[in-house]
Curated annotation (Swiss-Prot):
Homotetramer. It is an enzyme of class 2 (transferase). Belongs to the class-III pyridoxal-phosphate-dependent aminotransferase family. This is Omega-aminotransferase. It catalyses: 3-oxopropanoate + L-alanine = beta-alanine + pyruvate; 3-aminobutanoate + pyruvate = acetoacetate + L-alanine; benzylamine + pyruvate = benzaldehyde + L-alanine; (S)-1-phenylethylamine + pyruvate = acetophenone + L-alanine. Pyridoxal 5'-phosphate binds at residues 112-113, 318.
Length: 439
C-alpha cells in the first residue's frame, strides 16, 4: 500500500466520516470499472452502493467519459447568467422528455442539496407570485434526508443532521415517519400498513391554516435513513391533501431517480405526480457534479406572469448547467436509453427481492425492506453501542471485497443497474458471512 503519512491524511476533512477512526484504518480506492472498484493494492471491491447511490450506469462508461473529454477541449466553462450555451438547452430538453408528464421546466443545480434548497425557494416564490405570500410554512418528515443546506436540514428529520446547527429555519413542521409499523416487518415491496400517517398533514393544516403552508417535501423512498418504502396509499393521500389545500408537493428523488426503482422516477412507479422533483446523483452517473429541479408548467407560468422584476427568480449558481456537466448528462441519458437500464432494473427486481429477503434469517437481522434495486437490511443494535455493529459490518465487508453503505444500524444497498445475478449472489454471500463473524 502507498505510504499515506500523517500529513497526507490530516489535510482532508472528510465528509460524514469518523475522521479519527478512518485515519487509524484508511480505506482507499484508486480506480473503477463496471461493477468494481480497485484499491491501491490492486484488490477488487464489488460496488453494492453505486458509489453513493449515484453511479447507476456502472463505472467508467466510455460514452460518458468521451463526452466529458470532448467538451473540456471545446469549452471548459460558460456562464448561464444572461447568456447560455447549446448543451444547456439540449440537456434540459432531453431531461424533460423522461420526467413525469407536465414537469418539463428544468432548473440546473450542482448537487442534491442545492436541488432541495432550490425547490423550496421556488415553492415560496411561486405562492408570492400568485399573490399568496402568506404561504410560507414548509412541511418535511421525521427521518427524512434532504441534503445538507440549511433548507434541507430544516425540513429533514434526522436528528444528527440538525442538532449541531442551531434553530435552523423557522416555520417548519414534520410529518411522522413510517418506520417500524406493526405488520410491516420484512414486507416485500410496499408495506400494507401506514397510509393513515399521511393524514397528519390535515392536523398541521388545522393548526396553521392552509393559507400559511407552502409545500410538503418527502422522499418517495427514504434512502439515507435506511430505505423506508412508502406504505400502500400513503403518497396518494399526501397528493390528495395537498391538492385540497393548495399546497405544493415536492418529491426528493435524488436517490430514486434514473431507474433505481425500475422506472425513470419513483413518481411514475407509484403513479403519483408531484409539483416539483429534486434530482442529482444518477443525472450524470456522478461523472460530473450536477443536480436539477423539474417544475410543473403551472409553477413556471405563474412565475413568468406574476413577476414584479425583470428577473423572475432571483436564484442560481455559478456552475448551473456547467458545460462538462451537460455533456456528461446528455451522454448518461443516452446510455440509459441505449442499454435500456430502467427496464433492466425492473426485470431484476424479483431476483433481487428474493435474494435480499433470504437474509432475513441471518444473524443480527431484524428487518429487510426492498423496492426496485434498493434494499435495507436492519440489524439489531449492539447493546449500549448503537451503530457500532453496522460500522463493523461495513469495515469487514470492505476488507472482504464488498462496498456497502450503512446508516445507523441499517445496511443500505443500491447497486449499479448493470449488475448480474452472480453479483447479487456474491453480495448476499458476503453479507451473510460477515454477519456471522461480527458480534
Amino acid at each position: 500500500m502507498p505510504d499515506f503519512g500523517a500529513n497526507d491524511l490530516d489535510a482532508f476533512w472528510m465528509p460524514f466520516t469518523p475522521n479519527r477512526r478512518f485515519k487509524r484504518h484508511p480505506r482507499m480506492l484508486s480506480s473503477a470499472s463496471g461493477m468494481w472498484y480497485r484499491t491501491p493494492e490492486s484488490r477488487e471491491v464489488l460496488d453494492a452502493t453505486s458509489g453513493l447511490w449515484c453511479v447507476n450506469a456502472g463505472h467508467d462508461r466510455p460514452k460518458i467519459r468521451e463526452a466529458i473529454q470532448k467538451q473540456a477541449a471545446e469549452m471548459d466553462y460558460a456562464p448561464c447568467f444572461n447568456m447560455g450555451h447549446p448543451l444547456a438547452f439540449q440537456f434540459a430538453s432531453r431531461l424533460a422528455q423522461i420526467t413525469p408528464k407536465g414537469l418539463d421546466r428544468i432548473f440546473f443545480t450542482n448537487s442534491g442539496s442545492e436541488s432541495v434548497d432550490t425547490a423550496l425557494k421556488i415553492a415560496l416564490a411561486y405562492h408570492r407570485a400568485r399573490g399568496k405570500g402568506t404561504k410560507t410554512r414548509l412541511i418535511g418528515r421525521e427521518r427524512g434526508y434532504h441534503g445538507v443546506g440549511f433548507g434541507g436540514i430544516s425540513v429533514g428529520g434526522i436528528p444528527k443532521n440538525r442538532m449541531y446547527f442551531g434553530s435552523l429555519l423557522t416555520g417548519v413542521d414534520h410529518l411522522p415517519h413510517t418506520h417500524g409499523l406493526p405488520g410491516n416487518t420484512c414486507a416485500k415491496g410496499q408495506p400494507e400498513n401506514g397510509a393513515h400517517l399521511a393524514d397528519d398533514l390535515e392536523r398541521i393544516v388545522a393548526l396553521h391554516d392552509a393559507s400559511n403552508i407552502a409545500a410538503v417535501i418527502v422522499e418517495p423512498v427514504a434512502g439515507s435513513t435506511g430505505v423506508l418504502i412508502p406504505p400502500k396509499g400513503y403518497l396518494e393521500r399526501l397528493r390528495a391533501i395537498c391538492d385540497k389545500h393548495d399546497i405544493l408537493l415536492i418529491f426528493d428523488e435524488v436517490i430514486t431517480g434514473f431507474g433505481r426503482v425500475g422506472a425513470p422516477f419513483a413518481a411514475e412507479r407509484f403513479g403519483v405526480t408531484p409539483d416539483l422533483i429534486c434530482m442529482a446523483k444518477g443525472l450524470t452517473n456522478a461523472a460530473v457534479p450536477c443536480g436539477a429541479v423539474a417544475a410543473s408548467g403551472k409553477i413556471y407560468d405563474a412565475m413568468m406572469d406574476g413577476a414584479d422584476a425583470p428577473i423572475e427568480l432571483f436564484h442560481g449558481y455559478t456552475y448551473s448547467a456547467h458545460p462538462l456537466a451537460c455533456a456528461a448528462g446528455l451522454a448518461t441519458l443516452e446510455t440509459y436509453r441505449e442499454d435500456d437500464l430502467f427496464a433492466r432494473a425492473a426485470g431484476l427486481e424479483g431476483y433481487w427481492q428474493d435474494a435480499m429477503h433470504s437474509l432475513a434469517d441471518a444473524r443480527h437481522v431484524v428487518d429487510v425492506r426492498n423496492l426496485g434495486l434498493v434494499a435495507g437490511i436492519e440489524l439489531e443494535p449492539r447493546p449500549g453501542a448503537p451503530t457500532a455493529r453496522a460500522m463493523e459490518v461495513f469495515e469487514t465487508c470492505f476488507d472482504e471485497g464488498l462496498l456497502i453503505r450503512v446508516t445507523g444500524d441499517i445496511i443500505a444497498l443500491s447497486p449499479p443497474l448493470i449488475l448480474e445475478k452472480d453479483h447479487i449472489d456474491r453480495m448476499v454471500e458476503t453479507i451473510r458471512r460477515v454477519l456471522g463473524q461480527v458480534d
